[in-house]
Amino acid sequence: MANQREGRASGELIESRSIDYIPDAERHGSLASQFTLWLSANLQITAIVTGALAVVLGGDVFWSLVALLLGQLIGGAVMALHGAQGPQLGLPQMISSRVQFGVYGATIPLVLVCLMYIGFSASGSVLAGAAVAQLLGVDEVAGIALFAICIVVLTILGYRTIHLIGRVGSVIGVIAFLFMFARLFSNHDLGALLANRHFSIASFLLSMSLSASWQIAFGPYVADYSRYLPRGTSSARTFLAVGLGSVMGAQAAMVFGVFAAALAGSRFAHHEVAFIVGLGSSGAVAALLYFSIAFGKLTVTTLNAYGSFMSMATIVSGFRGQRAISHRRRLVYILAMVTVSTALAIAGRHSFLKEFTAFILFLLAFFTPWSAINLVDYYCFTRSRYDVPALSDPAGRYGRWNRTAIAVYVIGILVQMPFISTSFYTGALVDRLGGTDISWILGLLVPALLYYACACASSRRIPERLILPGEAARAGE
């Protein structure tokens, strides 16, 4: 009877699971769906804008393209390593962070995760709202509000629906980008752009930071969308499906942004939606481009809303000792997260590009140390040998606060501060490096090495296997 009930749950229209463990009987999905989800999430206008920044902020076309690709590969590898944990653990990404930080301690990066995804949702809603407004003939505020309603509905429906829109969005995105590339490249001498090379280490590393931060920013929730895959799914294949989808999608969009900024200049900057739609040769094509822009933002903004509600639920459940949340509480979290991001989008819609640039680069300082700690602990020490019931027990194996991990995390943030270069904060050593921002590199390497050394010296008890809810035995005790 239990298996029948679980089997029915896996086929429900509205997802019944949230922060709790996904039993084997409810596992489903394919690696192809992972690829299309992350391809769709990256074939969108915000990635175009991010790529354009490489040129807008001083880089040439050739070296910007090289740097963006290198950053994609590094950041994409980090992101995909997180994604590969999903099928093995059957848990949301940030719940599993309690293994490293403690049941209460995981709240520290979680609060920042919530802020990040609310910010991403807000910035994406500005661009999507502009497209919806033009498509339906309403003002931008109404366009943002209508887009938010769609996000609420899709987030409530949950995992299956998110993967469905990912599959649809990948098809729409590929068709739209093929058309946009063809229109952009017609009647232009690309060879001249690529031949004009002026290498600058500062611009090169800035471009790398843009694409690496773009990919790493997915890390705190990427496993949320692979956790339903069967437990026997190959980690290597999951890594490739997630990583290739994300890197290919983001690089294609950022390449378009680089060329658009180089060819169109001021006609593109601050007028991104209008420029893209202007590539259409007729009213019908323009309408389809508006639709593709809005739908392109639909996938990733739903991911952000789903991830932010899961993060909020994880924060609250940690202090309440809950292993799951009710449908009513789930709805409250979703409405709260989307309402806040929508209000921010409406309030800040006239200063999007400048604020977004500083936002994405500065947040990287807070997530690279978390990524480093989580990945080193999982791949070097615990693998999938987690005590799932203890993740909700402050008095259990993982405790309330893991002071070692928290200290390494704080050090990982502090070591970056002298090297951060954004519009609202510039580190003391940035000028000595010619304006080069190398903070994210230190934010990965220093915490990884420090946590590895601390974990080797630790006497903590690691289970001999994955301990599931309902099991009385505790391996390793």
What would you call each of these model-derived segments?
Residues 55-66, 130-143, 160-169, 275-281, ...:
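Transmembrane helix-loop boundary segments of multi-pass membrane transporters
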Residues 94-98, 125-142, 230, 304-335, ...:
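Helix-loop-helix connectors at the membrane interface of multi-pass transporters/channels
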Residues 110-114, 135-157, 171-182, 211-222, ...:
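Transmembrane alpha-helical segments of multi-pass small-molecule transport proteins
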Residues 31-48, 181-187, 197-260, 283-305, ...:
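Hydrophobic, membrane-embedded alpha-helices of multi-pass small-molecule transporters
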Residues 138, 171-197, 211-216, 256-263, ...:
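Hydrophobic alpha-helical segments and their helix-loop junctions in multi-pass secondary transporters
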Residues 266, 315-350, 397-416:
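Loop-to-transmembrane helix boundary motifs in multi-pass membrane proteins
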Residues 1-61, 203-209, 227-237, 458-477:
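Membrane-interface "cap" regions at the ends of multi-pass membrane proteins
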